[in-house]
């Protein structure tokens, strides 16, 4: 399966909503899984790979087209977080690194402080 995180706004708060897509592919075919994941993401620009992904020692390297960058050459924090969260669900992935033009890209701000789920009791 491939898990894709999209966002949904409820009561003026943005939440990451996971959707699981069942696919038939070779277990080792990480490029196909990442391509499907990117195609399933709701984003105003097409998301695509420009080079093969690599998975070494638990680190998945994803090489993306430059069209995902904003005018100031940075990536949208929400998009970055969605890609990393989605890719982290792939088998054997412990860390995700995103690259554009062979340069590793980072979010403008730390995405680890985001709240994924809130349950009101």
Regions found by a protein language model. Give the residues of each.
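Bimodal "functional hotspot" detector
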Residues: 1-121
